[in-house]
């Protein structure tokens, strides 16, 4: 838009020129100046437009009366094209043309690219391009490569790359390597493993639950097979779930065999018996072993007499227990020795206890020899004591006042 043309002439200003004019009033008038002349005055026309054309300046001749020549003032410049126009010089002097400074507006697409980083930083910095097809060629982590491989790129994007682009060369090299791998290993799947997602996690969770249910079902089938009562029909049982147990027959606790130890005189007999078997079988075996009548066999456990009808399970006998077997006198001898004394002889050990019958007129030497023979201690030096008194063997039971049930101690 062009500004209106306006003639400009000399106008009075303050400063040194004005003071000189005021000071000349009191002086003598000067000679009259020459009549008015035609002096061309320069008028600036600023054509403002959006184009990049330069400013047009038009100079038109205007008749201006010649004024008095003031002292030359310092020219002023105004960068803005306001209503006052350009700076004025002294009257009569040729005006200088001042061009307005304008900023050149450029298209954003034509803006020059200025490097942000220095040369060293730029050489070591690889910016990631925005194109998805070029992202595959950038060095990345294995997970990123798997994502890019799964997503893929369309052939139109590969064709859009320039023929001389380094990205296109790298893409071609990568495709050639993949083709070589496929030719060398045609049966091998070289596709990357998919990343675990939320769906895969939920799928794994459901698979784990299914496996647990299958295990519980098989355990229930195993319990039903081991139980005595099977409610399932054989048609419903699967051949894969059958369990065969190869074991011997389960015997009850009462029919279990164990070795019973029987001590008779100087012998120790080991006899296998059952827990539910009565001790009468033991009595018969010992009578046959000693060649005497079963009525003369007496079994003792500690100081208590065992009944032939008792069983090892009722007596709670174990493998470490030992039973003493005593041979009693015959019935004919019993009538003769009805007045005999039954004396107990106890050795140093607890199991070395023996009950011996002795007549009141017999010396104690008979008791000592019978004990040594029964315990297998013949030839050993033994000492017999009664109430703390050492016995020589020549004493009679009546002399010592012995009665049935008295205890005689033996020390070796």
Curated annotation (Swiss-Prot):
**Keywords, A to Z?**
Coiled coil, Cytoplasm, Isopeptide bond, Methylation, Nucleus, Phosphoprotein, Ubl conjugation
PTM characteristics: Methylation at the N-terminus by PRMT1 modulates interaction with the NFAT complex and results in augmented cytokine production.
User: What did gene disruption experiments reveal?
Assistant: Mutant mice are born at the expected Mendelian ratio and appear healthy and viable. No alteration in thymic T-cell populations, T-cell proliferation, or peripheral lymphocyte development. Inefficient type-2 antiparasitic immune response to the intestinal nematode Trichinella spiralis due to impaired IL4 and IL13 cytokine production by Th2 cells.
Q: Where is this region: Disordered?
A: 1-38, 58-115, 136-206
Could you tell me which residues carry Phosphoserine?
49, 51, 79, 81, 83, 118, 191, 197, 307, 362, 383
Biological process, per Gene Ontology: positive regulation of transcription by RNA polymerase II
Using the record, list the residue span of the signal peptide; answer none if the entry has no such feature. Answer: none
Where is the protein situated, by its record's location annotation? Nucleus; Cytoplasm
Q: Which domain of life is it from?
A: Eukaryota
Bias-annotated ranges (Low complexity): 86-96
**Coiled-coil region list:** 168-227
Annotated crosslink Glycyl lysine isopeptide (Lys-Gly) (interchain with G-Cter in SUMO2) location: 120
Q: Which GO terms describe its cellular component?
A: cytoplasm; nucleus
Which segments show compositional bias classed as Basic and acidic residues?
175-184
CDD domains (UniProt xref): Ubl_SLD1_NFATC2ip, Ubl_SLD2_NFATC2ip
Please report the stretch or stretches of sequence annotated as the Ubiquitin-like domain. 341-412
Q: Which residues get modified to Phosphothreonine?
A: 309, 311
Q: Subunit info? A: Interacts with NFATC2, TRAF1, TRAF2 and PRMT1. Interacts with UBE2I/UBC9.
The protein's role, per its UniProt record: In T-helper 2 (Th2) cells, regulates the magnitude of NFAT-driven transcription of a specific subset of cytokine genes, including IL3, IL4, IL5 and IL13, but not IL2. Recruits PRMT1 to the IL4 promoter; this leads to enhancement of histone H4 'Arg-3'-methylation and facilitates subsequent histone acetylation at the IL4 locus, thus promotes robust cytokine expression. Down-regulates formation of poly-SUMO chains by UBE2I/UBC9.
- Record protein name field: NFATC2-interacting protein
The source organism is Mus musculus
Which gene name belongs to this protein? Nfatc2ip
């Amino acid at each position: 838009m062009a500004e209106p043309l306006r003639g400009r002439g000399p106008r009075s200003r303050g400063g040194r020129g004005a003071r000189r004019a005021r000071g000349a009033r009191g002086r003598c008038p000067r000679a009259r100046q020459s009549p008015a002349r035609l002096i061309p005055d320069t008028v600036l026309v600023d054509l403002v437009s959006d184009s990049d054309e330069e400013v047009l300046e038009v100079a038109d001749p205007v008749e201006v009366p010649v004024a008095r020549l003031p002292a030359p003032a310092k020219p002023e410049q105004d960068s803005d094209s306001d209503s006052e126009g350009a700076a004025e010089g002294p009257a009569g002097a040729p005006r200088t043309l001042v061009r307005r400074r304008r900023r050149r507006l450029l298209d954003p697409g034509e803006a020059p690219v200025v490097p942000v980083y220095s040369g060293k930083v730029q050489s070591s910095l690889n910016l990631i391009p925005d194109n998805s097809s070029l992202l595959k060629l950038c060095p990345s982590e294995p997970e990123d490569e798997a994502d890019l491989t799964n997503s893929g790129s369309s052939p139109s994007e590969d064709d859009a790359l320039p023929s001389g682009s380094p990205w296109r060369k790298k893409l071609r090299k990568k495709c050639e390597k993949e083709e070589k791998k496929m030719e060398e290993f045609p049966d091998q799947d070289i596709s990357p493993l998919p990343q675990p997602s939320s769906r895969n996690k939920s799928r794994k969770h459901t698979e784990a639950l299914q496996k647990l249910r299958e295990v519980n079902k098989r355990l229930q089938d195993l319990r039903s097979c081991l139980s005595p009562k099977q409610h399932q029909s054989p048609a419903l049982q699967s051949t894969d779930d059958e369990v065969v147990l190869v074991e011997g027959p389960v015997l009850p606790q009462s029919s279990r065999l164990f070795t019973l130890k029987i001590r008779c005189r100087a012998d120790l007999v080991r006899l296998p018996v059952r827990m539910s078997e009565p001790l009468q079988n033991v009595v018969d075996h010992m009578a046959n072993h000693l060649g005497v009548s079963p009525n003369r066999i007496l079994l003792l456990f500690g100081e208590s007499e065992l009944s032939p009808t008792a069983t090892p399970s009722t007596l709670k006998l174990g493998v470490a227990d030992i039973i003493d077997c005593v041979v009693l006198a015959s019935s004919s001898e019993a009538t003769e020795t009805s007045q005999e004394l039954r004396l107990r002889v106890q050795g140093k050990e607890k199991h070395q206890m023996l009950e011996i019958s002795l007549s009141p007129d017999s010396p104690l030497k008979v008791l000592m020899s019978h004990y040594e023979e029964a315990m297998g201690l013949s030839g050993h030096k033994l000492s017999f004591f009664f109430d703390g008194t050492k016995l020589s063997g020549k004493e009679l039971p009546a002399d010592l006042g012995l009665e049935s049930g008295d205890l005689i101690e033996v020390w070796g």
